[in-house]
């Protein structure tokens, strides 16, 4: 059984949390995030510690309790440190370019793919085959990185495509000739 909901969230220095009728706003050095949570979960702020309490031990309450705690912790970490996902491109002629806030990808198609950065997301290119997606919302960073990867996900025969750094791609044997 998971006990994530019972863990205490410690607010780092410079991070403020405001709770107005379970609409929580977290402000930090990197920005501000707001999210509405279930009215069933009580959010208590005592100094620099946040604790979450559920009214009963039903299965639904336990799931909401753990999820709320994880989302709230991600908000606190996001506004203080931020999140980033790194992607790498493998394939002949595969490269990325930045045009303002737009990411332009050449991934073996007849046309370049263009990805507009959502609000709060920045793209960085340490080299033409590495893409770093960063921002304060873990959810939006993950969705944006997954979308970029989906434009040319790694194929199992040669391994060409866009993958997360450190991702293992299962390879297949090709057809055997006569």
From Swiss-Prot:
Highest taxon in the source lineage: Bacteria
Entry's Gene Ontology molecular function annotations: rRNA binding; structural constituent of ribosome
InterPro entries in the record: Ribosomal_uL6-like (IPR000702), Ribosomal_uL6-like_a/b-dom_sf (IPR036789), Ribosomal_uL6_a/b-dom (IPR020040), Ribosomal_uL6_bac-type (IPR019906), Ribosomal_uL6_CS (IPR002358)
GO biological process, one term: cytoplasmic translation
Record Pfam families: Ribosomal_L6
One GO CC term on file: cytosolic large ribosomal subunit
Classification via PROSITE patterns: RIBOSOMAL_L6_1 (PS00525)
Record SUPFAM superfamilies: Ribosomal protein L6 (SSF56053)
Keyword entries, A-Z: Ribonucleoprotein, Ribosomal protein, RNA-binding, rRNA-binding
Family: Belongs to the universal ribosomal protein uL6 family.
Task performed by this protein: This protein binds to the 23S rRNA, and is important in its secondary structure. It is located near the subunit interface in the base of the L7/L12 stalk, and near the tRNA binding site of the peptidyltransferase center.
PANTHER family, alphabetized: 60S/50S RIBOSOMAL PROTEIN L6/L9, LARGE RIBOSOMAL SUBUNIT PROTEIN UL6M
Quaternary context: Part of the 50S ribosomal subunit.
Protein's name according to its UniProt entry: Large ribosomal subunit protein uL6
